[in-house]
Amino acid sequence: MKITYIHHSAFLVETESAYLLFDYFQRKLPEFSEEKPLYVFASHRHPDHFSKVIFELEEKHPKIHYILAFDIWSKRVPESCKEKTRFLNPGQILDDGTLKVEGFKSTDEGIAFWCSVDGLEIYHAGDLNHWYWDGEDPQWNKNMTKAYREEIAKMHGRKADIAFLPLDPRLGEYFYLGIDDFVKEVDAKRIFPMHFWGEYDVAERLKKMPCSAGYRDRIVEIHEEGEGWEI
């Protein structure tokens, strides 16, 4: 399996049978083989996770499939791509024989994706995160904690080969909560931080915290756009 960090929350995963492109909206993409199907995911409608530029990929990739969150308006899909597009709801499962994907409800907008392909389990959180904001109304934060933990509890006992999880420095001292909660429910072999707004040191900061002692060796430190890994 090959993984490439594109930008923000965008990653490309290449398995034996398919490409999976998550939350792409800008920056240069690697070259794709036309022999493999390309699955393009958009977790929600926010412009840092979805752009109509993804539909331009259809011109070069005849085996393309779009899996979009339910909150993205269907009218934003060009006519030429409608038959290649599926919309996914929380709790819904799509399975085409190559890829199986399940949706989980985000604590912000849209969904998170749990993908099964070639015997691999791949999780992309989108904006499903523990958005605990300093200075926010205490009851709002309490509700957020409850909502996030209840949703990831639905994944309890699962094993993920890779998990793409938000690690947002804008949350201040609470930036780590989403990942810290997640690993209590899911056994993730490798954790790729995302949504860190160019602050690449957030992974290192988390790895230095006592709470990460049990999983810090699974956190991948990202240093630049276009960086790749083979697993």
Predicted regions and their residues:
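Active-site metal-binding motif and surrounding structural segment of the metallo-beta-lactamase
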Residues: 26-74, 153-164
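A short, acidic, amphipathic alpha-helical segment used as a generic capping/interface helix at domain edges
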Residues: 148-153, 172-181
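Short glycine-/acidic-enriched loop or helix-start segments at secondary-structure transitions
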Residues: 31-32, 50-53, 77-79, 134-135, ...
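Core dinuclear metal-dependent hydrolase active-site scaffold
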Residues: 1-35, 84-159, 223-231
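Short active-site oxyanion
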Residues: 1-2, 62-66, 190
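Active-site metal-binding loops of divalent metal-dependent hydrolases
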Residues: 24-26, 44-45, 71-72, 106, ...
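Binuclear metal-ion centers of metallo-dependent hydrolases, dominated by the metallo-beta-lactamase
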Residues: 4-8, 78-94, 176-231
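Hydrophobic/aromatic beta-strand patches that form the interior of the parallel beta-sheet core
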Residues: 41, 67, 86, 102, ...
